[in-house]
Amino acid sequence: MKKVLFIGNSHTYFNDMPQMVKELANAAGEELHVTMLTKGGMDFAWHQKQEQTAFNLRYGGYDFCVLQQAAHPFPGQEALSEGTKGICELAGEHPPRFALYMTWAEKAHPENQGEMTEAYRRTAREQALLLAPVGEVWQAFRKEHPDIELYFTDGAHASPAGSLLAAAVIFKTL
């Protein structure tokens, strides 16, 4: 059995997306245990200050940790890079394998995806992390399947279909 810790905000917990990752793993014959440390609107700087973040990373015995930074507004490359490094450092001597969960641009601002994509790719490359390119896949899927609504009614969060897409990309990455 593999254990996965998800650290993020509403883009992680909407529609219980980590549970979808678990169900995809089960369907593929793999046993997965998932745990979430999430709070709406919070970024990596907030998570670094929470005792449960360090405790889970050091003592939870996780195989993977999926990291999702604040997305709307996206705080930029520097905040992503520094926040990612800070959380990874909390893990101590036996860290899980970290994966960055690249989010998607708001429906009203698809032009923002390029900046997000570059920042996530650069951070993953520089810190030798896995990358779940959900935002890129999201953008391509919308072009190929405009009839399937990936966004929740607020134009920022995921619909159930959007969460399933995110879960599939994350499962494939892990």
Model-derived regions: residue spans:
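Conserved SGNH/GDSL esterase-like catalytic core that processes O-acyl groups on lipids
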Residues: K2-I7, H11-T84, K107
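Alpha-helical cap/lid subdomain in secreted, periplasmic
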Residues: A54-P160, L164, A168-T173
